Amino acid sequence: QDVDQLRAIMRKVLSPTSMKGGRWDLTAPDLVEEAWSVLCEFAGNNDPLKDIKADQNRKALELAPYVRKAVMQSNNSFLEAVKFAITGNQLDVMLDTKTGLKKERASEAAMLDASINNANELEKRIKKAHKIIYFTDNSGEVIFDRILMEQIRTISSAELILVARTLPILNDVTASEAQSLGLGYVAKIMENGIQEPLAGTTLSKTSKEIQDLVRE
């Protein structure tokens, strides 16, 4: 029965002309929105990955003490926090719904180097900034974002604003979820204002308030 339902979902997801190469003016977020609407229809709600997101956050929270300890013991706590924030992206449920970020995999953060070449420049700019806007992404990963923001707090007195989703889409964290995870203790939480389940962040579709903040 589950296999039959999955086939039915996939048939409907792949049925639009846009999924068959009939339209080339659409972006990946546009296609995701079409597929997401099908999943929501079959699930009977607008957040079919809610339980999975909660599980990803739980797994990340279990790792948080280990990560904080590694960050605090590092010779460069800011750089270490950046590494873990990048590694946390491996919690993306769209890649793997069964496993989370294991402690062993978290330790791989220490091996990141080439992708962190600009961390020193980033740190300098953060120290000079008066306002920092931090766009969140996936559930689970957001816990490591919080640890990075905690480090930002230690090196900068800038106003720190965290932007999360207004509406659920895939496994991205919503503003209400970010609040429940305690991110409001380290940053002001704002909704992105996008009134459709659009993956990614299209600035032109965010609220005027967010657009004005980015352009300041």
Question: Model regions: which residues?
Answer:
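Electropositive, gly/pro-rich neighborhoods at or near active sites that engage anionic ligands
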Residues: 1-129
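Conserved mixed alpha/beta catalytic, RNA-binding, or beta-rich assembly cores of soluble enzyme
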Residues: 96-98, 112, 127, 140, ...
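Short, basic, glycine/proline-bearing loop/turn elements
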Residues: 106-108, 133-135, 191-198
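Short, well-ordered alpha-helix to beta-strand connector turns
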Residues: 129, 186-187, 214-216
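A general structural motif
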Residues: 129-131, 157
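Short, glycine-rich nucleotide/cofactor-binding loops
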Residues: 131-143
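Redox- and metal-dependent alpha/beta enzyme cores, enriched for Fe-S-associated oxidoreductases
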Residues: 144-202
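A short, acidic, amphipathic alpha-helical segment used as a generic capping/interface helix at domain edges
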Residues: 201-216
